[in-house]
Swiss-Prot record:
InterPro entries, per the entry: Ribosomal_bL32, Ribosomal_bL32_bact, Ribosomal_zn-bd
Family in the record: Belongs to the bacterial ribosomal protein bL32 family.
Keywords: Ribonucleoprotein, Ribosomal protein
Single Gene Ontology BP annotation: translation
Organism: Nitrosococcus oceani (strain ATCC 19707 / BCRC 17464 / JCM 30415 / NCIMB 11848 / C-107)
HAMAP family, A to Z: Ribosomal_bL32
Molecular function as annotated in GO: structural constituent of ribosome
Domain of life: Bacteria
Region (Disordered): 1-45
Recorded name of the encoding gene: rpmF
Coiled-coil ranges from the UniProt annotation: none
Gene Ontology CC entries for this record: large ribosomal subunit
Protein name: Large ribosomal subunit protein bL32
Keyword Ribonucleoprotein: yes
A Pfam family it matches: Ribosomal_L32p
Length: 65
């Protein structure tokens, strides 16, 4: 089993942990509905880049009639 020869200093420990931070997700505003959503993700209403991409059952029935 590997054993360290010398104790790591708090400075070196901090330098190692410098890259462990988590970034906050980036949000955008949809220009058709004005809704906030994550970048490159579909809005909760089913819009992506101004176009409806996910249709609910009710919307499918309305289009068929």
């Amino acid at each position: 089993m590997a054993v360290q020869q010398n104790k790591k200093t708090p400075s070196k420990r901090g330098m190692r942990r410098a890259h462990d931070v988590l970034k906050k997700p980036t949000f955008s505003v949809d220009f058709s509905s004005g809704e906030t959503h994550r970048r490159h993700h579909v809005t909760p209403d089913g819009y992506y880049r101004g176009k409806k991409v996910i249709f609910s059952k009710d919307e499918n029935e309305e289009e068929n009639e």
